[in-house]
Amino acid sequence: MTKRSEAKYKIDRRMGQNIWGRPKSPVNRREYGPGQHGQRRKGKLSDFGVQLRAKQKLKGYYANISERQFHGIYVEASRLKGDTGENLIGLLERRLDAVVYRAKFVSTIFAARQFINHGHIKVNGRKVNISSYQLKVGDVVEVKEASKQLAHVLEASQLPERDTPDYLDVDHGKMTAKYIRIPGLSDVPFPVQMEPHLVVEFYSR
């Protein structure tokens, strides 16, 4: 198991949930957290603890975004019209790494970030190597021609545990994904329950 995989599964263990729905997640085999004290019975969380956990889970899901970056996304969401929690999800799903993952061009969101950073992705015909790049409705994401035959790309497109959401128009033959609309919470195929309203409560304290 690579260091990247270990870090990813450590998030699963800390949350006590298989947050990406992966068959190899260690929480499929046990119900306690990482470390020598992981098997201790957990007490009831305070309201703050519940809110913090919701934030950590959402941050972790999107490749463990840094606190500074995640808080910046929250601030932007709070300035938009409408529900801040829904806006937060919409902004997270506009990230290029999230779309590359949703389109099944790679098998994990961690791999999506690395794939973008290594220059394998174009947006509207131009190379973009910033994983946090914010897409707009109508943007077309594509895998570079020279990268389409990479083994992990071909494998990811066949993964059975993930369906592509309907806010993307994906062509796996051409390895393209058109961003059709900004989704809300109910549109996003999270394998576990995400609670952005608790994240809003955390930052509103």
UniProtKB/Swiss-Prot annotation:
* The protein's name: Small ribosomal subunit protein uS4
A Gene Ontology biological process in which this protein takes part is: translation
Database matches in PANTHER family: 30S 40S RIBOSOMAL PROTEIN, SMALL RIBOSOMAL SUBUNIT PROTEIN US4M
> Does this entry carry the keyword Ribonucleoprotein?
yes
SMART domains annotated for this entry? Ribosomal_S4, S4
Q: Which UniProt keywords apply?
A: Ribonucleoprotein, Ribosomal protein, RNA-binding, rRNA-binding
Name the gene behind this protein: rpsD
Q: What is the originating organism of this protein?
A: Bradyrhizobium diazoefficiens (strain JCM 10833 / BCRC 13528 / IAM 13628 / NBRC 14792 / USDA 110)
Question: Do you know which Pfam families this protein is assigned to?
Answer: Ribosomal_S4 (PF00163), S4 (PF01479)
Question: For the S4 RNA-binding domain, which residue ranges apply?
Answer: 94-154
Its signal peptide is none
The entry lists its GO molecular-function terms as: rRNA binding; structural constituent of ribosome
One cellular-component annotation, GO: small ribosomal subunit
Fetch the InterPro entries from UniProt. Ribosomal_uS4 (IPR022801), Ribosomal_uS4_bac-type (IPR005709), Ribosomal_uS4_CS (IPR018079), Ribosomal_uS4_N (IPR001912), S4_RNA-bd (IPR002942), S4_RNA-bd_sf (IPR036986)
Describe its assembly.
Part of the 30S ribosomal subunit. Contacts protein S5. The interaction surface between S4 and S5 is involved in control of translational fidelity.
Hey, which family's this protein in? Belongs to the universal ribosomal protein uS4 family.
Region feature Disordered, mapped onto this chain: 18-46
Role noted for this protein: One of the primary rRNA binding proteins, it binds directly to 16S rRNA where it nucleates assembly of the body of the 30S subunit.
Q: Which domain of life is it from?
A: Bacteria
